[in-house]
Amino acid sequence: MKKAIVSSLSFCLAVTSFMNNAEEQKPKKLEDVQFLSITYTDFKHGKTDRAMEIIKNHYFPASKKAGTQVPYIVKFQSGEWDMATLWNLKNGYSSMEWEVTEEGIKWLKAFNKQEGKEKSKEIRDEFNSLIQRSNHVIGYHPTDIE
């Protein structure tokens, strides 16, 4: 019984404290940040080199030809993931409202022109077949940190 009373009292104090702070708070938008879309990728055993070959020899050249963003790639030497791909979300979270982006369309057109429509599909299918699993997150980098 004593534990129940102490727990209830602690909860009430925490809620009251939160409510007081909520009344004092004002909306605040994040400033000086760069929003990022980050994909962690784990390739099937022995397939990382082929995946990197496709990225360097096919995907990056198409990005450059299309004038679209070339992602920042991090290859891990430890941990559960083989690679992280980071994309700058130029329009912040609102970039995620698009099912198909203008930049994505430009890239695919350049990739199809570079490889041929049928070959481009084969390359994309092959790349996807190399992936064991992946995870996608959104975050931000404070740009006022040097």
Residue ranges and their predicted role:
Residues 5, 27-30, 57, 61-72, ...:
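An amphipathic, aromatic/His-enriched active-site/gating alpha helix that lines ligand/cofactor pockets
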Residues 16, 82-85:
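Short, solvent-exposed polar/charged micro-motifs at secondary-structure junctions
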Residues 38-40, 137-143:
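Short amphipathic
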